Amino acid sequence: MNDERCDLLCLDAPRAEAIRVGLPGIEAAGEAAERARMFSDPTRLVLAAALGEGEELCVCDLAWISSRAQNLVSHHLRLLRSHRLVTSRRSGKLVMYSLTEEGRSLLHAVLGEKVIS
């Protein structure tokens, strides 16, 4: 007996099919997994959490908050932006960053109630 397999074939085909057709395709699942992977890096997770608390912050503030160099923070923000988890806008000489709705949802899934919405 294997604890990971059923001993009997008792497929509930209609229920299993209804679940199967509602799932994302392998490509969509891969894209979602890649976005989720963005928060596997502690620096990116701290930056996202700071944006979750501060709504909109510049690179200088994020570097100070995270105790990381500005160029490293910029690198991580570019990665988060390329995966549509943060957005940016220029305000004079500053570039301001904020979480997208998708980024906020993913951050909430990772950190739970620790994120202020």
Language-model features: where?
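Short, charged, intrinsically disordered terminal tails
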Residues: 108-117
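Short, charged/polar, Gly/Pro-enriched secondary-structure boundary elements
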Residues: 102-108
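N-terminal helix-turn-helix DNA-binding core of bacterial DNA-binding proteins
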Residues: 26-69, 95-102
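Beta-hairpin "wing" of winged helix-turn-helix
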Residues: 81-91, 98
